[in-house]
Swiss-Prot record:
Function, in words: Endonuclease that specifically degrades the RNA of RNA-DNA hybrids.
Subcellular location: Cytoplasm
Catalysed transformations (reactions): Endonucleolytic cleavage to 5'-phosphomonoester
Main location group: cytoplasm
Family: Belongs to the RNase HII family.
GO biological process, one term: DNA replication, removal of RNA primer
Keywords: Cytoplasm, Endonuclease, Hydrolase, Manganese, Metal-binding, Nuclease
NCBIfam families: PRK00015.1-3 (NF000595), PRK00015.1-4 (NF000596)
Organism listed in the record: Legionella pneumophila (strain Lens)
Entry binding sites for a divalent metal cation: D13, E14, D103
Domain RNase H type-2: 7-191
EC number annotated for this UniProt entry: 3.1.26.4
GO cellular component, one term: ribonuclease H2 complex
Gene that specifies this protein: rnhB
Name of the protein in question: Ribonuclease HII
Native organism taxonomy: Bacteria, Pseudomonadati, Pseudomonadota, Gammaproteobacteria, Legionellales
Amino acid sequence: MNTELKILMAGVDEVGRGPLAGAVVTAAVILKKPIDGLTDSKKLSPKQRNLLAIRIKEEALAFAYGRAEVEEIDQLNIHHATLLAMRRAVEALPIQPDNVLVDGAFTPQLNMPCKAIVQGDSLIPEISAASILAKVLRDEEMVALDKIYPGYGFAEHKGYATPVHKEALMRLGPCKIHRRSYSPVADLISK
């Protein structure tokens, strides 16, 4: 009889702190075993991310998403909204982890041990997996929002402050999914 207890570790990461538009999306992942190719989602091509996301969903012991909407970002600020989204992802896991590792320098308030790891998305497979799932989901959402709010180019820049996005903001004004607390959105509204 195997008396070894496996400690369940969840990795958590976020996508979407910097954009001018859209939600901040988080994921929490508990892996059964390592998955080849896991790394920070920003180091992967969209095709690589999509293929790995499929494998993660198939092979992970558990995964869940969390989010903070634009209104929450504007009310709380991006730091607190991100921590809220991270907590939501962990609480949505169908299996409670024994401990949680979070990419970055801060951790959400949880009922289990939690540690922040700077550059954890490149170092810890569970955080890498969370990074990939969050990135794929948020990118898909921004492509869908591009159809609802045409003219801003969300499918291309995913809400980040590119020259194309800033020009569209000047021309069209902000839409419902723009973060009013972010410059240049706030600057445009105050004019």
